Curated annotation (Swiss-Prot):
Monomer. Binds 30S ribosomal subunits, but not 50S ribosomal subunits or 70S ribosomes. GO terms for molecular function: ribosomal small subunit binding. It comes from Dictyoglomus thermophilum (strain ATCC 35947 / DSM 3960 / H-6-12). The keyword Metal-binding does not apply. One of several proteins that assist in the late maturation steps of the functional core of the 30S ribosomal subunit. Associates with free 30S ribosomal subunits (but not with 30S subunits that are part of 70S ribosomes or polysomes). Required for efficient processing of 16S rRNA. May interact with the 5'-terminal helix region of 16S rRNA. One of its GO terms (cellular component) is cytosol. It is found in: Cytoplasm. The gene is rbfA. Belongs to the RbfA family. This is Ribosome-binding factor A. One of its GO terms (biological process) is maturation of SSU-rRNA. Keywords: Cytoplasm, Ribosome biogenesis.
Length: 120
């Protein structure tokens, strides 16, 4: 079952990326959006989609509102594309791990620690 969860997660991640890129026309949704992870529930009925948005807090807020309002459309498009018996309910969640990682790298660079690791 775990393998099926992972396969479906990867497939949903690809499909939603494509849907957001080509079919969703909401101007609130930032073009600097990355789907970092999709976690499926054990029964495959729920998909938590973690997104990272590069931009200001206002842009992040607008993007999340746009995703929330497009959720029904995205789910219906998933149903057409995936041809699975039950299309999972989707939940978008903001993921700031990429931003945190970027901040850590900048701090290391300021301290001169990043260059030492690169030279090894």
């Amino acid at each position: 079952m775990r393998q099926r969860q992972e396969r479906l997660s990867a497939l949903i991640r690809e499909e939603i990326s494509e849907i957001l890129l080509r079919r969703v026309k909401d101007p609130r949704i930032s073009s600097f959006l990355v789907i970092t992870e999709v976690k499926m529930s054990k029964d495959l009925r729920y998909a938590h989609i973690y997104v990272s948005v590069y931009g200001s807090e206002e842009e992040k807020k607008q993007t999340m509102q746009g995703l929330e309002s497009a959720k029904g459309f995205i789910r219906s498009e998933l149903g057409k594309d995936l041809r699975i018996r039950f299309v999972p309910e989707i939940f978008f969640e903001l993921d700031d791990s990429l931003e945190k990682g970027d901040r850590i790298l900048r701090k290391l660079k300021e301290l001169g620690l990043e260059d030492e690791q690169d030279s090894e």
